[in-house]
Amino acid sequence: MQEKPIAVTPGEPAGIGTEITIKAWKNRSCPPFFLIDDVERVYSRAKDADLEIPIEVIKTPSQTLDCFHNALPILPHKFPVHCKAGRPVDDNAQSVTKAIKIAVDYAKEGVVSALVTNPIQKEILKRAKFEYPGHTEFLAALCGEKTKPVMLLASDQLLVVPVTIHEPLSNVPNILTEQLLIQTILVAERALKNDFSINRPRLCVSGLNPHAGENGTIGSEEEAIIKPAIESLKMRGLRIFGPVAADSMFSENARLEYDIAICMYHDQALIPIKTLDFWNSVNVTIGLPIVRTSPDHGTALNLAGTGEADANSMIAAIKLADKIYRNRLANGDPE
């Protein structure tokens, strides 16, 4: 098998992305990767964080393999404004999204094994007319996927998928449908088999309402939407159960009964995994023809330039991207 590097995008240039990427390289345990970034800015961020880092400027991703063990490979990508750590500027928004597109193109062309995206500052991009709620939706559009993208959060202790992602909580009951639930769960089951090599995955589905609706006495979504979706999927042979009350499905004993938790909305899924293992959790976009992971935290502008940013989630994201790529090859699934 020909080795391929991983492409890492810079994310918000005023955030901690560059610092945690440098720390990931210095950790010396990651598979080969290169950073798409402004070389002068990388040196500046390294100085801010009091990090010494040898850098090798590359012209093509393949050159990563020649220099990675001796220097951090940088594929030059200019930002129009040199912003200070912790102080984002709107004029850099287009360069942030362009770096993501470059990485996706490399992945689609097969010259990189995966992409790992550093956190973006959503309000900055929104002011620049960025039309997507976040990375997940943007990546699906770049890959030409017409189905709703699926976010999976992964740690050693838990795998979890929110059916609805970046939506106001007040909108969730109107967005949630039997079709959406079935579609999301089928994508999740396929990812468990092909990306995580779990041959017969067990799926636990949460309710939407307190106590999973108590048979329709606290809301109607469980009876009208969630239970019919589960029964339909059982008919297809999936090992799936629920709806389970969300307040009882994440205990240590409860987690032994399933391989993945399917939750109805963002915080229902992310609160438990971040509580269990905040700095080692990874965001994965599943259902795409390419492999994409990301550290499961934001830009942390308050930590940018201090040298105090924790790189464990970035390290975990790089390692998991490599693992998923290799699992797909072993399972004969290019996605």
Role assignments for model-derived ranges:
Residues 1-135, 175, 179-264, 268-283, ...:
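Contiguous, glycine/small-aliphatic-enriched amphipathic segments in soluble metabolic enzymes
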Residues 77-80, 148-150, 154-160:
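Flexible glycine-/small-residue-enriched beta->alpha junction loops
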Residues 127-150:
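Glycine/threonine-rich beta-strand-loop-alpha-helix active-site module
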Residues 138, 151, 160-162, 290-292:
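Conserved hydrophobic/aromatic beta-strand scaffold that supports enzyme active sites
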Residues 147-151, 326-329:
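Residue-level signal for secondary-structure boundary elements
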Residues 153-183:
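Ligand-binding beta-strand-loop-alpha-helix segment within the catalytic cores
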